[in-house]
Curated annotation (Swiss-Prot):
The lineage of its organism: Bacteria, Pseudomonadati, Pseudomonadota, Gammaproteobacteria, Pseudomonadales. Disulfide bonds: none annotated. It comes from Pseudomonas savastanoi pv. phaseolicola (strain 1448A / Race 6) (Pseudomonas syringae pv. phaseolicola (strain 1448A / Race 6)). SUPFAM superfamilies: F1F0 ATP synthase subunit A. It is found in: Cell inner membrane. The chain crosses the membrane at residues 43-63, 101-121, 160-180, 193-213, 232-252, 259-279. GO terms for biological process: proton motive force-driven plasma membrane ATP synthesis. Signal peptide: none annotated. One of its GO terms (molecular function) is proton-transporting ATP synthase activity, rotational mechanism. This is ATP synthase subunit a. NCBIfam families: ATP_synt_6_or_A (TIGR01131), PRK05815.1-1 (NF004477). The keyword Cell division does not apply.
Length: 289
């Protein structure tokens, strides 16, 4: 921090560890934001991918341990926690999902826990994980963004997966004709076939925008809230590195206050992502508009 300006410090913490095709024709890691940008579409955010997979495996291992230790007698703390979580998600699905599917509840549970774990990385002090990456790599300038949900590629990827399920179940339940009819015959209709034909482009435009808005809103809502939260933590860290005693003291107070408040944010954002997924899939299972 001492060798960086506040602006450089912030930019460094908001840059991903990117692997891709370098300008010299070789494959490797980008060391600057400009190099990462030049890599284009086929660049991989290694930090986002690594943390997403690692946290997904942690989720699977925790629930596998709970399942193996499950007993009909006196349950342990882990079993109690998992049962409460499963009951909570199952209740949310029963309240909001009006179709019949054995997939929705496990999907909702996976989304909630996985997104929560990715969000929770934001509670780790902002310098710890990047400094660990520097020690492992031996590169003092290597960028490393630790929170996957502050990367729009991660949130958009999850949202597009949900969107694919929306399209799949819409066609499965309503048929291809019903799905096309839903996009072209609503919200405006007429008994006159000629008028109805004229309304098809208007209906399609409105319904298509509504359909596309679902994954975009899912992705941007999660990304925006988590990115803003991470930026606040980074700005507080800048206070610590200011060299001014009173500003560092204020940073300590703000760090703890924001961390406590942020626990609510990371939980709420995971819950909202899960609930919107349930609602969107419930709408896809409805055989009427």
């Amino acid at each position: 921090m001492a060798e960086q300006t506040a602006s450089g410090y912030i930019q460094h913490h908001l840059q991903n560890l990117t692997f891709g095709h370098l300008p010299n024709g070789e494959w490797g890691f980008a060391h600057t934001a400009a190099e990462a940008k030049e890599m284009g579409f086929w660049a991989f955010h290694v930090d986002t991918l690594g943390w997403s997979v690692a946290l997904g495996l942690i989720f699977v291992l925790i629930f596998r341990m709970a399942a193996k230790k499950a007993t009909s007698g006196q349950p342990g703390a882990l079993q109690n926690f998992v049962e409460v979580l499963v009951d909570f998600v199952d209740g949310s699905v029963k309240d909001s999902f009006h179709g019949r599917s054995a997939v929705i509840a496990p999907l909702a549970l996976t989304i909630f826990v996985w997104v929560f774990l990715m969000n929770a990385v934001d509670l780790v002090p902002v310098d710890w994980i990047p400094q660990l990456a520097m020690l492992i790599s031996g590169d003092e300038h290597i960028p490393f963004r630790a929170v996957p949900t502050t990367d729009p590629n991660a949130t958009l990827g999850m949202a597009l997966s949900v969107f694919a399920l929306i399209i799949f179940y819409s066609i499965k339940v309503k048929g291809i004709g019903g799905f096309i009819g839903e996009l072209t015959l609503h919200p405006f209709g007429s008994k006159n076939l000629f008028v109805q034909a004229l309304l098809i482009p208007v209906n399609f435009l409105l319904e298509f925008v509504t359909l596309i808005a679902k994954p975009i809103s899912l992705a941007l809502r999660l990304f925006g809230n988590m990115y803003a939260g991470e930026l606040v933590f980074i700005l507080i860290a800048v206070m610590f590195g200011s060299g001014l005693l009173w500003l560092s003291g204020l940073g300590v107070v703000l760090q703890w206050a924001w961390a406590v408040f942020h626990i609510l944010i990371i939980t709420l954002q995971a819950f909202i992502f899960m609930m919107l997924t349930i609602v969107y899939l419930s709408m896809a299972h409805e055989d009427n508009h």
